[in-house]
């Protein structure tokens, strides 16, 4: 399935929507489907693994069967995490922590992966690996929801982009080619009156 991307300026509600889908906050209206609530895993800057834990301990906690599932289905992610197994979470870079979280979600057979600006504070190498990882898992059987305001990574992910337009209190599905159109940027940034 294509990656679902929520795009917009800071404070427009992208993260709030993601937290609602994750069950962290209650919806203002309606109901989040129970399958989504029960089968999601959120990767973000405000949820963390205890720093003193070793990656090997995380793998042991997940169990051999679950780790082997990741190894067989997502070999590149397994190999990446396996190389880190002797390190404590404290010694991992931000990007490595996020990949360990994604590994955990895959080992737990979660169907929905929710990421809130997960590439923030990542160097170019880790950002590239993270984006490639998301593309890889989305091409299998994982549904990825991704919050960002970075146009370059949105274009790289090549998913379904839903843009939050605060002036009109609306969310609009857009095409990747619209992301580089200055009129569209003006609508998002300055609240232009229209975009045709």
Residue ranges and their predicted role:
Residues 22:
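Helix-to-loop junction immediately C-terminal to a conserved catalytic motif
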Residues 51-67:
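Q-loop/switch helix immediately C-terminal to the Walker
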Residues 88-92:
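Conserved ABC ATPase signature
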Residues 100-105:
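ABC ATPase nucleotide-binding domain "signature" region
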Residues 107-111:
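A short, proline-enriched helix->beta-strand linker immediately N-terminal to the Walker B motif
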Residues 117-118:
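Walker B catalytic motif
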Residues 123:
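ABC-family nucleotide-binding domains
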Residues 147-149:
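H-loop/switch region of ABC-family ATPase nucleotide-binding domains
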């Amino acid at each position: 399935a294509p990656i679902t991307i929520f795009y917009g300026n800071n404070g427009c509600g992208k993260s709030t929507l993601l937290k609602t889908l994750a069950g962290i906050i209650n919806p203002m209206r309606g109901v989040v489907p129970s399958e989504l609530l029960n089968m999601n895993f959120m990767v973000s800057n405000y949820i963390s693994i205890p720093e003193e834990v070793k990656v090997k301990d995380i793998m042991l906690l997940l169990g051999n069967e679950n780790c082997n599932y990741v190894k067989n289905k997502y070999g590149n992610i397994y190999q990446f995490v396996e190389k880190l197994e002797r390190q404590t979470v404290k010694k991992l870079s931000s990007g490595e922590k996020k990949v360990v979280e994604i590994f955990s979600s895959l080992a737990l057979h979660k169907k929905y992966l929710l990421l809130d600006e997960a590439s923030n504070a990542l160097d170019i190498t880790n950002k590239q690996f993270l984006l490639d990882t998301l593309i890889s898992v989305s091409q299998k059987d994982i549904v990825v929801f991704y919050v960002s305001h970075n146009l370059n990574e949105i274009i790289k992910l090549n998913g379904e982009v839903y843009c939050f337009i605060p002036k009109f209190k609306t969310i609009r599905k857009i095409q990747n080619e619209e992301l580089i159109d200055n009129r569209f940027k003006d609508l998002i940034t300055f609240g232009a009156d229209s975009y045709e």
